[in-house]
UniProtKB/Swiss-Prot annotation:
Single GO cellular component term: cytoplasm
Protein name: Ribosomal RNA small subunit methyltransferase H
Family of the protein in this entry: Belongs to the methyltransferase superfamily. RsmH family.
Gene Ontology biological process terms from the UniProt entry: rRNA base methylation
Binding site for S-adenosyl-L-methionine: A46, G47, H48, D63, Y87, D108, Q115
Comp. bias intervals (Basic and acidic residues): 271-282
A Pfam cross-reference name: Methyltransf_5
Keywords recorded for this protein, A-Z: Cytoplasm, Methyltransferase, rRNA processing, S-adenosyl-L-methionine, Transferase
Region annotated Disordered, chain positions: 269-308
Length: 308
C-alpha cells in the first residue's frame, strides 16, 4: 500500500491561506451571529470558517486530512472546535463532544485548494508525484486502483464518476501499460491517458475527468455526500441553515434531489448560486462552484428518511 506524505514532515504556517469560493453568498445563506453554532464539515484551509467566526458564530470544523487539522489547530482561532473525521459521520463526531443540534452546516465538497496545490498529495496531473489522491492518510490509493482493478471495473469508474465518454479506451490503455511496469506517478498516468485520447491537441487536459473519477472513487465522495446531507438534516435545529457548494454535476444533482425530496428542508435557492464574473476572474476554481442552501422547518414525526 502506498503511504501518503506525513503532515508532520511539512512546515506548518501560522496563517491559513485558503481563499474561499462564494464567500459572501455562503455567509448570507448561513446567517452567522453570536450564539449560533455552525458546522463546517469540510474545514480545509478554514477560509469559510474564518468568515463565520468573524460574524460572531461558534464553529465546529471537521476534516479527515491531518495536514488541514494541524493548520487549523496551530492557528488557534477563538470559538473554533476542530474534530478529526469525515463529515458523513458528523452526528457521531458531535455527539462525542455533547452536541446534538446546530444552527448551520456548511459542506464545501471535493478536494480543497491546498490539497490541489500540494503536489505531493497526487491530486494533480500537472506535477509529478506519487499517485495517491487520498484525503485521509488511510485506505486504498489511486495507484492501487489503477494497478489492481480489472479493465471493466476501471472503465465503469471512469465513466460514472468522470462522465468520460472514452472510458473504455482509457481503461484499456491503463491495463496495457501496467503490464509493462506499475503505474506509480501522476504524470505517468496522465501521459498514458493523453496517448490513448483520440484527437487531443490543446485545451482541457484529457486526464482531467479520469483523475476526477479516481479521486471520487478513492475517497467515496458521493457516498460521503449522501450520508452528510442526511446527517446535516438531522442535526439542524428548526430555522437552521444548510449550505452546500458542489463543483460538478454529479454532486449538484445529489444535493438538488435531496433538497427536493426532504420534508424538513425548505430550499432558499431556486437555482444554484454561481460565482460572479469578477470572482471567476480572480479565483479560477470558483468557475464551476454551485451553491445551494436550505432552511430546516418543522415536520411531523415518523417521516421516512430521504433516499438520494
Amino acid at each position: 500500500m502506498n503511504t501518503a506524505p506525513s503532515p508532520s514532515d511539512r512546515p506548518l504556517s501560522h496563517a491559513l491561506s485558503h481563499t474561499p469560493v462564494l464567500a459572501a453568498e455562503v455567509v448570507a445563506a448561513l446567517a452567522p451571529a453570536p450564539g449560533r453554532v455552525i458546522v463546517d464539515g469540510t474545514l480545509g484551509g478554514a477560509g469559510h470558517t474564518r468568515l463565520l467566526l468573524e460574524a460572531g458564530a461558534s464553529v465546529i470544523g471537521i476534516d479527515q486530512d491531518p495536514y488541514a487539522l494541524n493548520r487549523a489547530r496551530e492557528a488557534q482561532l477563538p470559538q473554533l472546535t476542530v474534530l478529526e473525521g469525515n463529515y458523513r459521520d458528523m452526528r457521531e463526531l458531535l455527539a462525542g463532544i455533547g452536541v446534538t443540534q446546530v444552527d448551520g452546516v456548511l459542506l464545501d465538497i471535493g478536494v480543497s485548494s491546498f490539497q490541489l496545490d500540494d503536489a505531493a498529495r497526487g491530486f494533480s496531473y500537472h506535477t509529478d508525484a506519487p499517485l495517491d489522491m487520498r484525503m485521509a492518510q488511510s485506505g486504498e490509493s489511486a495507484a492501487e486502483v489503477v494497478n489492481g482493478y480489472p479493465e471493466e471495473e476501471l472503465a465503469a469508474i471512469i465513466y460514472e464518476y468522470g462522465e468520460e465518454r472514452h472510458s473504455r479506451r482509457i481503461a484499456r490503455a491503463i491495463v496495457q501499460a501496467r503490464t509493462q511496469a506499475p503505474i506509480q506517478s501522476t504524470v505517468q498516468l496522465a501521459e498514458i491517458i493523453k496517448r490513448a485520447y483520440p484527437g487531443f491537441s490543446k485545451g482541457i487536459h484529457p486526464a482531467r475527468r479520469t483523475f476526477q473519477a479516481l479521486r471520487i472513487h478513492v475517497n467515496d465522495e458521493l457516498g460521503a455526500l449522501r450520508d452528510g446531507l442526511r446527517a446535516a438534516e438531522a442535526l439542524l435545529t428548526p430555522g437552521g441553515r444548510l449550505a452546500v457548494i458542489a463543483f460538478h454535476s454529479l454532486e449538484d444533482r445529489i444535493v438538488k434531489r435531496f433538497l427536493r425530496a426532504s420534508p424538513t428542508l425548505k430550499s432558499l435557492t431556486k437555482r444554484p448560486v454561481e460565482a460572479s464574473e469578477e470572482e471567476r476572474g480572480r479565483n479560477p476554481r470558483a468557475r464551476s462552484a454551485k451553491l445551494r442552501a436550505a432552511e430546516k422547518v418543522a415536520a411531523p414525526e415518523g417521516l421516512p428518511e430521504v433516499e438520494v
